From Swiss-Prot:
This is Small ribosomal subunit protein uS9. One of its GO terms (cellular component) is small ribosomal subunit. It holds the Pfam family Ribosomal_S9. Residues 18-27 have a biased composition (Low complexity). GO terms for molecular function: RNA binding; structural constituent of ribosome. It comes from Bifidobacterium longum (strain NCC 2705). PROSITE patterns: RIBOSOMAL_S9. The gene is rpsI.
Length: 163
């Protein structure tokens, strides 16, 4: 009689395992996340960005300047704003950013990572899958290779003369 109860438990466990799936939620990133403040830090090359997202109407403040003043390039503006556009949250958050170090491209990449991490902190369940799939939560670890002794640059060697 005890054997029969164990068999029924095994069958139930097998049914539970077949219902489990590792696929991401198709509804992720549909813009239904909670509207609350969030904070994230992003780094790229030598740039470090500290990003705070607060509920608002979509204003950007980067080191006390607007997004258009700080990044005149539309390409960099699009890169910085891409996590918010992906989650369809345009006009729902104001971004206050402090960024230093590096050049414009490195700073834009650092801000993008900071914004993505802030959105992830705001609503992990709704936002994480879409942000991760788009690659916004991955830190770009590429940095400038150091110059080596005896070479002109990191890999550029002096011209070779056979005779």
């Amino acid at each position: 009689m005890a054997e029969n109860t164990n068999d029924s438990q095994v069958v139930e466990t097998e049914e539970e395992l077949t219902n489990y799936t590792t696929e991401t939620n198709a509804g992720a990133g549909t813009g239904t996340s909670a509207i609350e403040p969030g904070y994230g830090t992003g780094r790229r090359k030598e740039a470090v960005a500290r990003v705070r997202l607060v509920p608002g109407d979509g204003k950007w403040t980067i080191n006390g300047r607007t997004l258009e003043e700080y990044f005149p390039s539309k390409l960099l503006q699009r890169e910085v704003n891409s996590p918010i556009v992906l989650l369809k949250l345009e006009g729902k958050f104001d971004a206050i950013v402090l960024v230093d170090g590096g050049g414009t491209t490195g700073q834009a990449g650092a801000i993008r990572l900071g914004v993505a991490r802030a959105l992830n902190a705001i609503d992990r369940d709704a936002n994480r899958a879409a942000l991760k799939k788009a690659g916004f939560l991955t830190r770009d670890a590429r940095v400038v290779e150091r110059k080596k002794a005896g070479l002109h640059k990191a890999r550029r060697a002096p011209q070779f003369s056979k005779r």
